[in-house]
């Protein structure tokens, strides 16, 4: 089962939320890979807010969503250099990371989608659907080594996000 990371960036702060809602309404079959989605928004002061694309009970237990939140935090936040080096060494494209971060300048938003080709879901169909909306589409493969690293990293990231939210 291969994994693909699809990120759609928008030059408007609330556009990612609007697009996600529209895609969910127009979705006619489970072929779209929308089970694991994270939404990132950047306000005028440059603060990035990350949240799951869905709010089901037990979202913290959804491994893929937690992985996406960690990865989005690494790409858009002020990450530790060793974490960036580890995921680049694991095979994540540094150019991809730089391009996504660059597109999130000013007030902006993004959808992070983890698309797993598993015989039911189709990453190509997901990309085609997202391309209907006026944003910038970025995609890369997500190697198993990066997923393994993020699995350990995600719990530390989620804990730090919860601490920041409660302050």
Task: Identify what each model region corresponds to.
Residues 1-110, 115-167:
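Positively charged, small/polar-rich N-terminal and surface patches that mediate targeting and assembly
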């Amino acid at each position: 089962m291969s994994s693909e990371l699809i990120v759609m960036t928008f030059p408007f702060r609330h556009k990612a939320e609007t697009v996600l809602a529209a895609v969910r309404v127009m979705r006619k079959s489970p072929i779209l890979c929308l089970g694991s989605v994270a939404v990132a928004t950047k306000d005028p002061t440059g603060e990035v807010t990350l949240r799951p694309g869905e709010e089901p009970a037990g979202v913290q237990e959804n491994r893929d969503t937690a992985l996406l939140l960690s990865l989005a935090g690494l790409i858009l936040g002020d990450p530790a250099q060793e974490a960036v080096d580890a995921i680049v060494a694991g095979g994540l494209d540094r150019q991809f990371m730089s391009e996504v971060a660059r597109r999130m300048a000013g007030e902006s938003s993004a959808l992070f989608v983890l698309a797993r080709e598993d015989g039911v879901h189709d990453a190509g169909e997901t990309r085609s659907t997202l391309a209907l909306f006026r944003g910038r589409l970025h995609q890369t493969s997500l190697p198993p080594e990066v997923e393994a690293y993020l699995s350990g990293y995600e719990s530390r990231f989620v804990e730090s996000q919860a601490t920041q939210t409660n302050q």
